[in-house]
């Protein structure tokens, strides 16, 4: 049973492509060459500015994605600046070339209009798409946030939607 759970957890975040040496993946993002490095991160996790990040291809609701990240001693990714936003986009593009919608750790599930990262940190950086957040054009049904592939910006969405996600290890809030 433990072996089955271990294999399942590996499959949740298994990359669609893996490098030959297992330590780094090179990818092209716009005109910038970006390397995803494992550093001291576990298998299937990639290092950036002292944190480890994992793309999870399995489609889950926002809450289930957060629970999965917590089971990995992490949270859905919190993004604190443009450089980190670019890294997360690179990570998503590496594993999903179409860059489909992907959950990040931002939500206002605790209080409407009060956006907060799932790791408890305050929001000091945003990358909203034009007209967002809009709560579903007037409703109060969109409380969780995903990245939008083509515009590479953020959108609020119903938390029950099943999407891939990005986990990141915890840090002290900036």
Regions found by a protein language model. Name each.
Residues 1-174:
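Extracellular, disulfide-bonded carbohydrate-recognition/adhesion ectodomains
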């Amino acid at each position: 049973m433990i072996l089955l759970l271990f294999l399942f957890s590996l499959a949740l975040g298994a990359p669609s492509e893996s490098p030959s040496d297992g330590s780094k993946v090179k990818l092209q993002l716009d005109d910038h060459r970006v390397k995803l490095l494992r550093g001291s991160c576990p298998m299937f996790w990639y290092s950036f500015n002292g944190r480890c990040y994992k793309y999870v291809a399995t489609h889950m609701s926002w809450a289930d994605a957060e629970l999965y990240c917590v089971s990995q001693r992490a949270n859905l990714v919190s993004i604190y600046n443009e450089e980190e936003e670019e890294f997360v986009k690179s990570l998503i593009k590496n594993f999903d070339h179409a860059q489909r919608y992907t959950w990040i750790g931002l939500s206002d599930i605790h209080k409407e209009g009060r956006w907060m990262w799932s790791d408890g940190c305050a929001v000091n950086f945003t990358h909203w798409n034009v007209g967002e957040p809009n709560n579903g054009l007037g409703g109060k049904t969109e409380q969780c946030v995903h990245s939008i592939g083509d515009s590479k910006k953020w959108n609020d969405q119903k938390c029950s939607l099943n999407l891939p996600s990005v986990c990141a290890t915890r840090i002290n809030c900036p």
